Swiss-Prot record:
Summary of the function given for this chain in its UniProt record: Component of the transcription factor SL1/TIF-IB complex, which is involved in the assembly of the PIC (pre-initiation complex) during RNA polymerase I-dependent transcription. The rate of PIC formation probably is primarily dependent on the rate of association of SL1/TIF-IB with the rDNA promoter. SL1/TIF-IB is involved in stabilization of nucleolar transcription factor 1/UBTF on rDNA. Formation of SL1/TIF-IB excludes the association of TBP with TFIID subunits.
One Pfam family, short name: TAF1_subA
Protein's UniProt name: TATA box-binding protein-associated factor RNA polymerase I subunit A
Cellular localisation: Nucleus, Nucleolus
Molecular function terms, GO-annotated: DNA binding
GO biological process: transcription by RNA polymerase I; transcription by RNA polymerase II
Record keywords: DNA-binding, Nucleus, Transcription, Transcription regulation
Organism of derivation: Homo sapiens
Description of how the protein assembles with itself and partners: Component of the transcription factor SL1/TIF-IB complex, composed of TBP and at least TAF1A, TAF1B, TAF1C and TAF1D. In the complex interacts directly with TBP, TAF1A and TAF1B. Interaction of the SL1/TIF-IB subunits with TBP excludes interaction of TBP with the transcription factor IID (TFIID) subunits. Interacts with UBFT. Interacts with CEBPA (isoform 1 and isoform 4). Part of Pol I pre-initiation complex (PIC), in which Pol I core assembles with RRN3 and promoter-bound UTBF and SL1/TIF-IB complex.
Top-level taxon of origin: Eukaryota
Length: 450
């Protein structure tokens, strides 16, 4: 593997043997394919044009990566290093980043690659592509984190944090903030461990004060590293969660709420469902008024109508005294069950079955018809076919009963799903099925008496 990285220092001269191959200490084999790659056979002619051969080599690498042929990709990669000598200045400047992205992907998945190989490659690429130093350092740190090497990752980030080269640009500033924030995440991890250690100590324990001070020191470092990043528009979920957890731990609930509110509602930030989830969970922990919880989940509903929190949203709406909220509660349940991933959600079907009956008993037929009109052409096949009746009854009789009740209320007693469940002989559910039959007869929206 050391030979793989050594190629980054310069191209091989023309008089080298084309048959030469390299077998690194790590056990990765890299035959020299210069002649093969430089020769693109078309009609028996040989093309030696530099741009054409490097382009062909790049195509070979990409194809090998797509097919997960890591050894073959590594062999082509060995030849692709010649792009560092491209006469086109634009391509020559772009080459280090391309080589880093391709090479790191190969080394990450190659079965004979190891930590030493990746580290050597990363360090060489940082020095060759100085304009990409920060980006490569960050990605290198993430690789180390993936392998559980927290100390090495932290050292890598600290070195990158103090690196100075070239002009200060907005993109460079964001990268530095990102590097500092990931360093903050590592400090947060240490803080979490210290906090756990503190929770196991009695306040009268002689070590308590020392550990408590250690916890505070780590939280201060983490806050300093993360706070700058989360003010920049972007999706910073792990950083926001860590920062808020520490603010809550030290009793700064107002500060935590301000961070989460800005993250969710600042128009400069991209739309992010998690931002509203974090804010909702925080307000819920603080026992915020129902109206606040509803306002947060209402936005989440507009972004992800199938989210699991929509069932909580329905419960909040159902308990509200406002008629518009109770009407929205019905819309939310229908919205959840519009999605294929929710078709087996028995809680959603239970809520809908019970809520439909209550709404119809309360003379709000128009609410149901409004939701059903846009679904009556596809819900019967999507939810209430004969096939689903047999399948649901076989897999989950409780689910089948809830769905059958909804089917009966929406489609009447002639619905095939409803009729199939009605005919089943089940000792435990027998009484429930009889009650369901009476309710459908009385409240179904296809019943003329309504």
């Amino acid at each position: 593997m050391s030979d793989f990285s050594e190629e980054l220092k310069g191209p091989v001269t023309d008089d080298e043997e084309v048959e030469t191959s390299v077998l690194s200490g790590a056990g990765m084999h890299f035959p020299w394919l210069q002649t093969y790659v430089e020769t693109v056979a078309i009609g028996g002619k040989r093309r030696k044009d530099f741009a054409q051969t490097t382009s062909a080599c790049l195509s070979f690498i990409q194809e090998a990566l797509l097919k997960h042929q890591w050894q073959q990709a590594a062999e082509y990669m060995y030849s692709y290093f010649q792009t560092l000598e491209d006469s086109d200045s634009y391509k020559r400047q772009a080459a280090p980043e391309i080589i880093w992205k391709l090479g790191s992907e190969i080394l990450f998945y190659h079965p004979k690659s190891n930590m030493e190989s990746f580290n050597t490659f990363a360090n060489r690429m940082k020095n060759i592509g100085v304009m990409n130093y920060l980006k490569i350092s960050l990605q290198h740190a993430l690789y180390l984190l993936h392998h559980g090497m927290l100390k090495d990752a932290k050292r890598n980030l600290s070195e990158a944090e103090t690196w100075r080269h070239g002009e200060n640009t907005s993109s460079r500033e964001i990268l530095i903030n990102l590097i500092q924030a990931y360093k903050g995440l590592l400090q947060y991890y240490t803080w979490s461990e210290k906090k756990m250690e503190l929770s196991k100590l009695d306040k009268d324990d002689y070590a308590y004060n020392a550990v408590a001070q250690d916890v505070f020191n780590h939280s201060w470092k983490t806050s300093a590293n993360i706070s700058a990043l989360i003010k920049i528009p972007g999706v910073w979920d792990p950083f926001v969660k860590s920062y808020v957890e520490m603010l809550e731990f030290y009793g700064d609930r107002d500060g935590a709420q301000e961070v989460l509110t800005n993250y969710a509602y600042d128009e400069k930030f991209p739309s992010n469902p998690n931002a509203h989830i974090y804010l909702y969970n925080f307000l819920k922990r603080q026992k915020a008024p129902r109206s606040k919880l509803i306002s947060v989940l209402k936005i989440l509903y507009q972004i992800v109508p199938s989210h699991k929190l929509m069932l909580e949203f329905h419960t909040l709406l159902r308990k509200s005294e406002k008629e518009e909220h109770r009407k929205l509660g019905l819309e939310v349940l229908f919205g959840v069950l519009d999605f294929a991933g929710c078709t087996k959600n028995i809680t959603a079907w239970k809520y809908l079955a019970k809520y439909l009956k209550n709404i119809l008993m309360g003379n709000h037929l128009a609410w149901v018809q409004e939701e059903w009109n846009s679904r009556k052409n596809w819900w019967p096949g999507f939810h209430f076919s004969y096939f689903w009746a047999k399948s649901d009854w076989k897999e989950d009789t409780a689910l089948a009963c809830e769905k059958a009740f909804v089917a009966g209320l929406l489609l009447g007693k002639g619905c095939r799903y409803f009729r199939y469940i009605l005919k089943q002989d089940h000792q435990i559910l027998g009484k429930k099925i009889k009650r369901m039959k009476r309710s459908v007869k009385k409240y179904s929206i296809v019943n003329p008496r309504l």
